[in-house]
Amino acid sequence: MPVPGATVMTYAAAPGRACGSCTLCCKVYALPQLEKPPGVWCGHCAPGQGCKIHDALPEQCRRFNCLWMTDGKMPDEWRPDRAKFVLSLYPENGFVYGQVDPGSPAAWRRAPYFDGLRAMAKALIAERRHVLMFLGDDATLIMPDQALSLGKMTTRDNFRIEQVFGPQGPTWRAARI
């Protein structure tokens, strides 16, 4: 499993990677330019086939950086249409954000994904970066030892984490600020 902290932010597909029949980003993200809310298929998407206006994509679509596409070491089972969530590196803070298909809200909690997300979180925390999974605007912070619900959030909201020590050893707490 690759470590996102070692991944160079790029919008270019890794060698051998292509969207193919994957169109999940066309469902899970809001597209304000097209007045498309999150969680519903874009009217220009042919699910499982691709975009019908690919030559005239909105800027948000052209600039999107699907982590599976840009990280050639990420296993094939992490391709968004298989995993049922889309991971990306948020350019402003380097966090890994996942947007979950509302038709499969617990997909990221299944094997091998939850353990992989926790491994990413462990690698990123030393860099003060984090992994957040979103179902719509409900955010869950993935920590090395657990998943912490943060409630409704946007990419502009902030949170604070702290390590605490208990009878089972160190763990984490998070709070919105």
Predicted features and spans:
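Short loop/turn segments that flank or connect secondary-structure elements
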Residues: 1-177
